[in-house]
Amino acid sequence: MKLNRSGLLAALLGVALVATAAPLKTDPAKSTVSAVFKQMNVPVEAPFKKFSAQIDYDAAKPDLAKASVEIDTASLDVGEAEMNKEVAKKDWFNSAQFPKASFVSSAIKSAGAGKLSVTGKLTIKGKSNDVSFPLTVKSEGGKQVFEGALPIKRLAYSVGEGEWKDTSMVADEVTIKFRVTAGQ
């Protein structure tokens, strides 16, 4: 049987489309990313005001999912204008040199009904580490809602240098908490 080039191309494109998850459009108004940490042993939750997420997800084929997130490091809002400027400086995020923190998934696996196990690379301040975390996914108002929390050690990413390496003031443990709403 002879297959012409355009027929072969159409067949290959059809296979490629079947083998990927659907790209979703994130809803920034209904999405949040925040850093949760302790300062002088007092819990603080500080939102990042600017971030973007790209999610390819099909509930019927979760293992084909992909996700990436970029966070504007200078957009962390710790609740006080002077402190917001401080965390953008060199000792903390060094936002002038490293304006973005990012996460790119390498594998997303089903972990039961409404649960996913995510593995990927987290990059903050030019330092990258492999990370894994669970997340939940549910349908809400015709959209998918992805929620999770990723615990990290801030010093592994050089966030808090100089006098700020002292973890008695700001704990080394930080949880990146997120809720991303996305739909077609």
Language-model-detected regions and their locations in the chain:
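Bacterial N-terminal signal peptides that target proteins for export
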Residues: 1-10
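Hydrophobic h-region of N-terminal signal peptides that target proteins for export
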Residues: 12-20
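Low-complexity, acidic/polar, glycine-enriched regions of mature
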Residues: 20-184
